[in-house]
Amino acid sequence: MPKVIGLTGGIASGKSTVSELLSVFGFKVVDADKAAREAVKKGSKGLAQVREVFGDEAIDENGEMNRRYMGDLVFNHPEKRLELNAIIHPIVRDIMEEEKQEYLKQGYNVIMDIPLLFENELENTVDEVWVVYTSESIQMDRLMQRNNLSLEDAKARVYSQISIDKKSRMADHVIDNLGDKLELKQNLERLLEEEGYIEKPNYGEED
């Protein structure tokens, strides 16, 4: 019977890389970030609701959501984050549920790629939770390089989520991403072998 696995981690923990690798191994990935973008795409009901609640500043000159404006707004005003989530989350849930059910019907194991799985208390909607683990210092380094953030901004984003250590304690399985991409792939393969998703290589004996 196909399984539904929740994949999560801290910001800049390497979760996207793990998602890509899992799709190579035959899993179907349902991406919460992708669903969130679809929920407020140009011309959508979701975007119309955003404009109604947050005003014209929330929409850029191309008729799309002004992500920089909205990002700063919700990051600095928690009550605004709740208002935005109240618009987006129900739409995202519907998009993801439809995609998940379609894959399950086809017999695939499904990865629900959800960055804020624990924060939104969604762990009971999946069969297992896998956490991609790295250290907070690596998270901050990656954020500063990837997003061109100051150390203070990187810290603020890391600390706005449940800590990676706590998430790891709450997970069914932890995927170590303290090393490079090759080590990450090897760690993931080991987990997939142990859980029976892929076969262990049988090198046999030479004659």
Swiss-Prot record:
**EC number(s) of the enzyme?**
2.7.1.24
| Subcellular localization, as worded in the UniProt entry | Cytoplasm
Q: Which InterPro entries match?
A: Depp_CoAkinase, P-loop_NTPase
Superkingdom is Bacteria
Reaction equation(s) it catalyzes: 3'-dephospho-CoA + ATP = ADP + CoA + H(+)
Q: Which Pfam families match?
A: CoaE
GO biological process terms held by the UniProt record = coenzyme A biosynthetic process
Any single GO CC term annotated in Swiss-Prot or TrEMBL for this entry: cytoplasm
Q: Where is the signal peptide?
A: none
Which pathway features in its UniProt record? Answer: Cofactor biosynthesis; coenzyme A biosynthesis; CoA from (R)-pantothenate: step 5/5
Give me the residues that bind ATP, please. A12, S13, G14, K15, S16, T17
The enzyme's main class, written as a single word, is transferase
Task: Quote the Gene3D superfamilies the UniProt record gives.
Answer: P-loop containing nucleotide triphosphate hydrolases
What GO annotations for molecular function exist for this entry? ATP binding; dephospho-CoA kinase activity
Please list the residue ranges annotated as the DPCK domain.
4-203
What UniProt keywords apply to this chain's record, in alphabetical order? ATP-binding, Coenzyme A biosynthesis, Cytoplasm, Kinase, Nucleotide-binding, Transferase
Family named by the database record: Belongs to the CoaE family.
State its role: Catalyzes the phosphorylation of the 3'-hydroxyl group of dephosphocoenzyme A to form coenzyme A.
Its name, as the record gives it, is Dephospho-CoA kinase
Q: Which organism is it from?
A: Staphylococcus aureus (strain Mu50 / ATCC 700699)
